[in-house]
C-alpha cells in the first residue's frame, strides 16, 4: 500500500468511498485513524501525528480534509508548509497519509503541490454521466449482495 494518496475531482462522494476502501484494506484500527480539517488546524498537527508511531498496531492513517493551502485561496491559518514538504519527501513507513482535495483547484506553481504530485498516488473522481451513474448504483447494490433493476437505479438521479 502506498504511503501518500491525493484525492482530486468534483465527486466528493466517490472520493470518500475510495478513502474508506483504503482505510478498510489497511491494518490500522479505529484508534490509529485520525482526521484533520485544514480550515481549523495547522498541517503541522497532522505531520506530527503521522510521524508518531501507531498505538498497539502496525500502521496508522492520517487524513487531511479541506487542504486549501494547496490552492490560491486566502487562508485564516498560516500552515507549516516547509514541514509538510519535508514530510512528503520522506513519509513515515508506518503511516498512510491521505489528502482529500475534493472540489479544490490546486495551484501547480506552489512547491508543495509539485512535491505532492510527484510523491503521491493521485486519484481523480469526475462527475459521472447518467449511464455511468446508473451502472455505479447497480454495482454498489451488487457489492452489498443486493439487487436493483436499471429502472429503479435511474430513480436515484431523477
Feature annotation, model-predicted:
Residues 1-158:
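Conserved beta/loop motifs at nucleotide-recognition and modification sites
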